[in-house]
Amino acid sequence: MHLLPELASHHAVSIPELLVSRDERQARQHVWLKRHPVPLVSFTVVAPGPIKDCEVTRRIFNHGVTALRALAAKQGWQIQEQAALVSASGPEGMLSIAAPARDLKLATIELEHSHPLGRLWDIDVLTPEGEILSRRDYSLPPRRCLLCEQSAAVCARGKTHQLTDLLNRMEALLNDVDACNVN
């Protein structure tokens, strides 16, 4: 289920392309939920800027896939089906996991908090009925910015930071993980 970094497109996506990609992801999620009546993990990489598919995002994605598989194995949860693809919005993974949806969401939230790359992952958990479990459902604060203590959404909306600073931080986090062989 890993993606080859050297095959990244480096395509700069437009807002309309991102919106179409989001709609296509939702359609894929509904197909998966019909095929497997268990919770679905939908996994993407948080990638600021117009280039969503590059070597860095694919490497970050691959670490996330490894971490999600390890989480399922550690918990004794069966992965019924898994797939990876690349859309206009970058690398995407889907895993149908036989586990209680709320337990799965709490475990993925912990993974996002505890893994050095977790801040760069967007891990959604959908119930078998298609409900997306949110951080708000657990009274958790919104995601923090990569560079400061503000909410990531506030900084993104206000364009508080330079894109190059955000991308450099992403790459530094990735290089630290690779240097330490963290999975």
UniProtKB/Swiss-Prot annotation:
<keyword id="KW-0808">Transferase</keyword>
<comment type="similarity">
    <text>Belongs to the CitX family.</text>
</comment>
<dbReference type="GO" id="GO:0050519">
    <property type="term" value="F:holo-citrate lyase synthase activity"/>
</dbReference>
<dbReference type="InterPro" id="IPR005551">
    <property type="entry name" value="CitX"/>
</dbReference>
<protein>
    <recommendedName>
        <fullName>Apo-citrate lyase phosphoribosyl-dephospho-CoA transferase</fullName>
        <ecNumber>2.7.7.61</ecNumber>
    </recommendedName>
</protein>
<keyword id="KW-0548">Nucleotidyltransferase</keyword>
<dbReference type="GO" id="GO:0051191">
    <property type="term" value="P:prosthetic group biosynthetic process"/>
</dbReference>
<dbReference type="Pfam" id="PF03802">
    <property type="entry name" value="CitX"/>
</dbReference>
<comment type="function">
    <text>Transfers 2-(5''-triphosphoribosyl)-3'-dephosphocoenzyme-A on a serine residue to the apo-acyl carrier protein (gamma chain) of the citrate lyase to yield holo-acyl carrier protein.</text>
</comment>
